[in-house]
Amino acid sequence: MWKEKVSVTPPYHFDRVLDRLSLDPLNAVDREAREVRVPIRNQAGDVCIVKVQALGHAGEPEFLVSGETDQGEMMKEIKRIFQWENHLQHVLDHFSKTSLSAIFEEHAGTPLVLDYSVYNCMMKCIIHQQLNLSFAYTLTERFVHAFGEQKDGVWCYPKPETIAELDYQDLRDLQFSMRKAEYTIDTSRMIAEGTLSLSELPHMADEDIMKKLIKIRGIGPWTVQNVLMFGLGRPNLFPLADIGLQNAIKRHFQLDDKPAKDVMLAMSKEWEPYLSYASLYLWRSIE
């Protein structure tokens, strides 16, 4: 077993990370111990469980990271997932001069934390689209429990190769709509067959990823934007069609109705180039 201490540039509020992670019942979060156990597939495709425990506080963030094997590979992934090499002070300084300054002051130090893999993120987005959040989490939980892997009490999303072999009825039995079953399985087949390479995405520009993924049946702009944000950690995404964002803006700016997309677009100009953080902090303001 290996252990490694990591210090991160402040501010970094890990308790708020745990708050958000705990919204998903699949995440192995222990708030009292201030830790999360993260399932990561190594290059061989095997599931490794990595524990991340907070030792410090938002002003002096320090973590103890531990696992059984593959220390170098796992540490690289943990730093990517938790965005430890991105300095939040630059983001906070930017928003201190904008109409979202109050929200950023209240939630200061909240990082943009990624899903544990791009495939996980893509499947979650496809499954969650056009569902209320409660049932969306129920459906992803059923999906992972039925076809994923459990190690040391922690659930990991299935491999695309596993889902590629399913029949649509296998997902219909979990209360997937027919279309959602088709989108989930067909996209997984593209990945398993090599028609869609997820390993290429980190090296592509946002616009090129949008053009590539939007051609896939069942993947629309909202899904691509969320994959860019929570799968790849891109900093400048603002999903205008997101109901949560619309509600957060309505509440923050005390509007009578949810804002139209052109209004949201005009508002968001001053928040660039950190629109993903504007999205995250607006969501946090209504959670």
UniProtKB/Swiss-Prot annotation:
GO terms for cellular component: cytoplasm; protein-DNA complex. GO terms for biological process: base-excision repair, AP site formation; DNA alkylation repair. InterPro entries: Alkylbase_DNA_Glycosylase/TA (IPR051912), DNA_glycosylase (IPR011257), HhH-GPD_domain (IPR003265). The record marks W222 as: Determinant for substrate specificity and/or activity. Keywords: DNA damage, DNA repair, Hydrolase. The active site is at D242 (proton acceptor). Belongs to the alkylbase DNA glycosidase AlkA family. This is Putative DNA-3-methyladenine glycosylase YfjP.
